[in-house]
């Protein structure tokens, strides 16, 4: 949800050009939400030192607790990118307000360098054989679920009719 909120902030700023809102509210929100992504992921040797975010639930809540959900990783990267954009924009508009925010949030150059490293090295699952980006690391290993075999009265609220562990193992 953090990245979705950050995306809404950035979209609002892009559409309205409301620089005062950027200075008064948005920059701080974008920075703090970006920090979440820098805390929850890691550079994984097993993924060529790409930045991975594991044990997340993306927008497909029927596939919960997965590694490197494509949507989550993409939105996390964009959240961090938006935070860096906001800081640059704020500094160019009102350096005093920028300096106050940097002090308030205790932002250091090392943190921004780390964010840049994340942006440039975010991991996205890719299936070489099919030439597609699956929704997460394990998606292609899951068994296809033949929806035509689900009775109509059981299609809604799958968790009421099927155990979550059964649902999680399906495509």
Spans of model-derived segments:
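Aromatic-rich carbohydrate-recognition surfaces in CAZymes
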Residues: 1-42, 72-73, 80-87
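Conserved alpha/beta enzyme-core scaffolds, especially Rossmann-like or related mixed alpha/beta domains
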Residues: 26, 55-56, 94
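Flexible glycine/proline-rich, aromatic-decorated loop/lid segments
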Residues: 41-57
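Acidic/His metal-coordination segments adjacent to aromatic residues that form catalytic metal sites
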Residues: 53-68
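A conserved active-site cap/scaffold subdomain adjacent to cofactor or substrate pockets
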Residues: 72-96, 100, 116
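Active-site core of glycosidic bond-cleaving carbohydrate-active enzymes
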Residues: 81, 100-171
